[in-house]
Regions:
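Ligand/substrate-recognition segments at binding pockets and active sites
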Residues: 13-21, 31-129, 153, 202
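Disulfide-bonded cysteine motifs in exported proteins
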Residues: 6, 48-51, 69-70, 142, ...
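Positively charged, low-complexity/disordered segments
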Residues: 1-9
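Detector for C-terminal structural segments
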Residues: 8, 13, 21-26, 77-88, ...
Length: 237
């Protein structure tokens, strides 16, 4: 989901909004979803008229009162605001979804509880990972399903990804691991078990005349990724 914060012309914003709604509807239709009435978008800044009587490919009726667990505004205003927009967009597609502000630790308890692994529909959380990309294995290998106590909360299960992940863990060289990591990313890019929203900007300050890092362009910053990378930072004489 992307949110257009600035637009130059009303007609451009209208076309963008309508186009996104129509694209979402076409994805549902192509996947075999049906509806008594597919609704319409009026083509202005108002909300779409959502579909009614929507059903899945096998006639499944979507659950009612689905919740998006997301941190409240007191913890993270960005994630809270995104959850409100996303819930509204999903409702415009004919699904009964509401954003529910929830404490961070409460969300963790809900979605990572093996006994409750199928008892929720949506959640939003932020996280950080280290430089070595083995987190992709922890998050998405089928053996790490949260129903078994792991971190794979979506229940993602793709044998092709599992095979590449196994090879990644067995890699003997950095170059081999990089190639396999890129393959994992390519598969995840297509399957999208997570929808990544944004990475907040990080401001880090260091003495460039005294120290030199082998790299500085890293998500979440050097402090989060490697605690400042003391093993590889060089001092200048």
């Amino acid at each position: 989901i992307s949110i257009r914060l600035v637009g130059s012309e009303m007609c451009i914003r209208d076309r963008d909004t309508v186009g996104k709604w129509e694209k979402a509807i076409s994805i549902l239709q192509d996947a075999g979803w049906t509806a008594d009435d597919w609704g319409e978008h009026p083509g202005n800044e108002t909300r779409a008229i959502p579909p009614t009587g929507i059903k899945g490919p096998n006639g499944e009726v979507p659950p009612e009162d689905m919740l998006i667990y997301a941190p409240g505004p007191g913890y993270d205003q960005l994630r809270n605001t995104f959850s409100l927009f996303i819930a509204d967009y999903i409702r415009q597609l004919g699904f009964d979804v509401t954003a529910r502000p929830t404490g961070f630790s409460v969300i963790v308890d809900i979605v990572f509880d093996a006994a409750n692994c199928e008892g929720w529909n949506f959640y939003m959380l932020g996280w950080g990972v280290g430089i070595y990309p083995d987190s992709a294995v922890a998050f998405f290998h089928s053996r790490n399903d949260s129903c078994n106590g792991g971190f794979n909360t979506p229940g993602y299960n793709n044998p092709e990804f599992d095979a590449v992940a196994d090879a990644f863990e067995a890699a003997k060289t950095v170059d081999e691991a990089i190639a396999l990591s890129n393959q994992m990313e390519a598969i995840l890019f297509e399957d999208l078990p997570y929808l990544v929203l944004f990475n907040p900007p990080v401001l880090e300050v260091y003495r460039g005349d005294s120290v030199e890092f082998p790299f500085t362009d890293v998500l979440s910053g050097l402090t989060s990724a490697c605690n400042g990378c003391p093993g590889v930072v060089k001092t200048k004489s």
